[in-house]
Swiss-Prot record:
Protein name: Valine--tRNA ligase
Taxonomic placement: Bacteria, Pseudomonadati, Pseudomonadota, Gammaproteobacteria, Pasteurellales
Subunit note: Monomer.
Gene name of the encoded protein: valS
Organism per entry: Actinobacillus pleuropneumoniae serotype 5b (strain L20)
GO MF term (any one): ATP binding
Motif ('KMSKS' region): 560-564
Gene3D superfamilies: HUPs, Isoleucyl-tRNA Synthetase, Domain 1, Valyl-tRNA synthetase, C-terminal domain, Valyl/Leucyl/Isoleucyl-tRNA synthetase, editing domain
Renumbered ranges of motif 'HIGH' region: 48-58
Coiled-coil portions: 883-954
Amino acid sequence: MTQNLQMADRFDSSAVEQALYKHWEEQGYFKPTENPSLPSYCIAIPPPNVTGSLHMGHAFQQTLMDTLIRFNRMEGNNTLWQTGTDHAGIATQMVVERKIAAEEGKTRHDYGREAFINKIWDWKAYSGGTISQQMRRLGNSIDWDRERFTMDEGLSNAVKEVFVRLHEEGLIYRGKRLVNWDPKLHTAISDLEVENKESKGSLWHFRYPLANGAKTADGKDYLVVATTRPETVLGDTAVAVHPEDERYQSLIGKTVVLPLANREIPIVADEYVDREFGTGVVKITPAHDFNDYEVGKRHGLPMVNVMTMNADIRAEAEIIGTDGKPLTTYEAKIPADYQGLERFAARKKVVADFEALGLLDEIKPHDLKVPYGDRGGVPIEPMLTDQWYVSVKPLAEVATKAVEDGEIQFVPKQYENLYFSWMRDIQDWCISRQLWWGHRIPAWYDEAGNVYVARSEEEVRQKHNLPADLALRQDEDVLDTWFSSGLWTFSTLGWPEQTKELKMFHPTDVLITGFDIIFFWVARMIMFTMHFVKDENGKPQVPFKTVYVTGLIRDEQGQKMSKSKGNVLDPIDMIDGISLEDLLEKRTGNMMQPQLAEKIAKATRKEFENGIAAHGTDALRFTLAALASNGRDINWDMKRLEGYRNFCNKLWNASRFVLTNDKLDLSAGEVEYSLADRWIESKFNRTVGEFREALSQYRFDLAANAIYDFTWNEFCDWYLELTKPVFANGTEAQKRGASQTLVRVLEKLLRLAHPIMPFITEEIWQKVKGFAGIDADTIMLQPFPKVVKSELDESAEMQIGWIKELIIAVRNIRAESNIAPSKGLEFLVRNVSDEQRKILAENDRLLKAMAKLDSVQVLSADENAPLSVAKLVGNVEVLIPMAGFINKEAELARLTKEIEKMRGEITRIENKLGNEAFVAKAPEAVIAKEREKMQEYQNGLEKLQTQYQAIENL
């Protein structure tokens, strides 16, 4: 019986993908089962910001996650991919503040806290689903009914529970300490939100007079202090020298007079001081510098805060002791003409006043890194503020041990050292933020200043037996976004309730994330989870067993993608395509700097002169998987994307060949499997083994390459061709053998490729399943292929491998000698073994058909051959007689011209690369391109010379 069907000439991803995804979602294929006996597999997605849209980094990591999820679902595991979005406190608040400013000319203060928060919820309802829809476009097999948001009621309850319990355990406290303060946004920000920018600055050398007649070793009555921040001079409470610096040892314990403020401050010895920096004497300003803060604590120095929350100079200094409490025994007045000055205006005035007093020694140019708030865009100010803190050292010890003991493994392993270095030097974590949007701190104050922590105001009153008429005010601050994110793996599963989901899916299996948030998020998840989630034996649970750390996706030149550089690529544009005009608008629209827009437009036109073509989701996903080498940053490559779109078409066309073949015979009857049939089954099983091994090591690149290599190089280029002689001249039993093998291997190949390429594999599988006798709804619930050892056939692999080499040798001779592929050739071989002679005899018809041979003849060792072109295949000599095929002299003359032309190109590039001026000025990418061209020309020259030699030897 022959059966076939109609298939379109090419795979149209745009006509298939969204309809298929809708069907999958409606059928509930993404949902975990209720069966507790099945082994579970769970990944919690790093929650993207609700403000955001999908970028290439998201697409990259989510492709890897979905590959694992789909693979494990097909393995029969009860699979959950827990998704959701993060409320992203500061980012979201800024988006909505900008929106109301632009549309209504209002600020959040015009609205008031409650109304403004409602405005954010309205905005979230309107635009918060953008990223979810984009994730659907990527083919992510997520149970959307379980989508969570970090401000959902359940997650908010978990946040309050954690805060209250940590406070009850004495691990959360309120104190006045130094934080990164954004004077524009008026909030503390985390280290992750601080961007250190290279800046050309100055190093001012000021003279601080020694008090009480003291002198330096060389007789001076002053110390020269080097500083990059003159504006904080009024907050100095000491100067410091290195204890082993002989220049100043006699002065340790003495005092200097602080200019402008006219108060004495001590000279302290501290190993923090770099003797080579400036003069080896530094000012210590504990209220305005993180290093000075630590020095101040070691030496019991008071902290003199001279700045307001706007980073202007205060009218009256705030003086705090090392215990964080106000200090009334220390006096530090601020001169009247500094009061109210903006910090950089104060800097200028301090320098001018030192100069007027004859105390400015010198000014040196100095390169430094200035910390900026990444959202406010202004230099941050270390600021003494009242904040809430988590005492994390006890939590960190347990979390560090979990990685040391192998309960959690980092892939690549080198990231464990980064984790350890952070965890072993961990500082208390500032968790409060001066924002309106976020989890409000569950603490209340009465008018006497007493603080009450509980899950609600009602619980405060019950717990502390407070009368109903006692006025309570809730803390205005919200929690750092990373606090709620730190509970992500267990709060999304219903904790603090002991839900069946928590029992079934926790700990999760793997976290896929970037190296930049190992400390800010990964470490905090480990700390919180192990503190709050225990197994049935009371042992702390880890949040995940493996952390797979990805590199960054960079542009083709290796630059980080950013809006300001205008090199951002939208993964949806890779899928659907985008015109040049729309791409230019996306990259340059609404830019503040027109000059920058012009530069970006020029670069975009050069790189994408015709815009970006549609490639489909499968090609994008396959490219991302194929580029995922362990832990390294990835330079995006449009050519690879185009190549993998071609790969999708190759798979589609191979399927068309199989399913529309009118000679395909799947009828009942005698079946004979050929050597080629046994070979392709064996090669497929080896590919399955390679894929499984690669995936178990998180080598997505090797897994993708295994599929690509088998599909293109074995199945399409060889096996499909090897079946053609069978269908043309084989017996009915042989045709059935080839037909069954084609369908069986194609169906298994689709299952193998499905985790990476879900859409095209489902679309083809729906057509294949009838041929394969499968009655099922979807490929995604079919079993993933396993290695069948009985189908591994080393003999078949060896025999077909050798036959392929013979065919390739003949094809190379044709190409080198300009003989048409259709022209029949005589084929002579010499120096064959008895086994090889047998293989030739059994596969004579196959070899003739595949290599277009008129005859196959084995020569004895001493038998003379006619004038031939020869190739060696191992020890075997392949000879093709050339009589009548070519005009030797004419062909040699043609090749001589080609060789000279190629040598000229090589000389041209050698001269270019030998030009020092060119190499110094040209971008690295241009130089790399020239070297690539040089290699191509050298390879071409080698081939031409080989061809010349072969013909000359005729």
